[in-house]
Amino acid sequence: MTKKLYLPLLMAMVVALFSSCSKKMGELSADYFTVTPQVLEAVGGKVPATINGKFPEKYFNKKAVVEVTPVLKWNGGEAKGQPATFQGEKVEGNDQTISYKMGGSYTMKTSFDYVPEMAKSELYLEFKATIGKKVVTIPAVKVADGVISTSELVNNTLGNANPALGEDAFQRIIKEKHDANIMFLIQQANIRSSELKTAKEFNKEVANVNEAANKKISNIEVSAYASPDGGVSLNTTLAENREGNTTKMLSKDLKKAKIDAPIDAKYTAQDWEGFQELVSKSNIQDKELILRVLSMYQDPAQREQEIKNISSVYKTLSDEILPQLRRSRLTLNYEIIGKSDEEIAKLASSNPSELNVEELLYAATLTNDPAKQEAIYTQATKQFPNDYRAFNNLGKLAYQAGNVDKAESYFKKAASVNASPEVNMNLGLISLIKGDKAAAETYFGKAAGTKELGESMGNLYIAQGQYERAVNSFGDSKTNSAALAQILAKDYNKAKNTLANVERPDAYTDYLMAVLGARTNNSSMVTSSLKSAVAKDPSLAKKAATDLEFAKYFTNADFMSIAK
């Protein structure tokens, strides 16, 4: 009787034991898991998450091995993260051991490559468990929602970026000058008949400039000099007389030619600067010694004496250098006045061959009509095919029109002519908008000196998830991307100011303002801005309907009437 009762009792205990073990390795509550961030967010093209999990007390079978895999799921797809494996106390292995009695905590870091479908997704933990050779089923646990993808808007705001312009070097007024020298004999100030030919040729140039319709005389300078030999007192009188005689002659000639031009006259008693310049350019013996004397002594008399002491070269100086310093220099300063804006604009459309490359490129800046600008730049590529700027600027127009492939073609053509910093920067923008961050960074590295480089680097930093650095790089730039960086860096006041001053606002300007409204709890800003965005780009309604930036508005009737 006792044996009959004992056997069924033993079997019942075994069944109960296995039943108990199975329950302990069963479903885990979501309360045992926390995820940072609570709502997953795309950063630099990735969706990172830190998962803190816990196996409760008396749960983890001593012979169990459990593999935990983060899985991000969305409608029609999923992405798996790196799994982690845990083992019970009686398992021989190298994985983290979890105590049956005390349970155990663990931390997992995971990251998924972002795809747009993840905007409406859920993060699960999936379990693969065995006890010995027996497979144990542990249901998957949902631990987070995702994905806030605001950073990925950089792929859209890039279209609002400013490509670098190949700027013209047009100058309406170009300053020019014409020089002539009236030479004098040693210790003389009279103008010799042999020098009158020089004066006559100079006066002829003055007359030509005066008569030219596109030239204007500024003034004529008379600068008279004496060579350093002979003492300060003598040379002062000598230089003054040379200046006086030259000015008198020039004034007489101008009056005779009926030319009204101001004369600015001055004299230099001892032309040590001219002496030093001529010696430096010469091949005379002991040149370095002479130059050293000039640097060591400032007193004119001492300089002259020390140089005379270098007897080996003084005769050469007297014969070759000093005579060139006994002169009056005549300088005609005048301006070449270029075509007016009206003339350039008219010729650009009617007879562009009359314009040089700088004038033609400048003509494109006189209109805000992209079609007219394109026509001008196209003409420039025909007239000046070896100038990269027109090709580059056609690429800029195509980029701003949203035609990335056409822009790339023009930028590559420009690069084949001249791989300038501007062209490299623009090719970097193309690479960035096509998702090749490494190539973009390489191109930007060759774009030093371009005005727009800070803005372009700001876009790259957003794409890399470096938001504070992006804000600094944008500076005071007023673009959608600059505002996006400020939103991501949580500088909402600055972002609002930036969006209000975007030069070429578009649908994404309004969409970012709606995001800003959601982040600052301004419901009227959300609805009004989103309504404006959808009016410009209807596809943004569908995006807003699943954008977790607006999660708390998904039950708002006004919001849902727009995002439908």
Residue ranges and their predicted role:
Residues 2-513, 517-546, 552, 560-564:
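N-terminal targeting segments with Sec-dependent signals, encompassing both cleavable signal peptides
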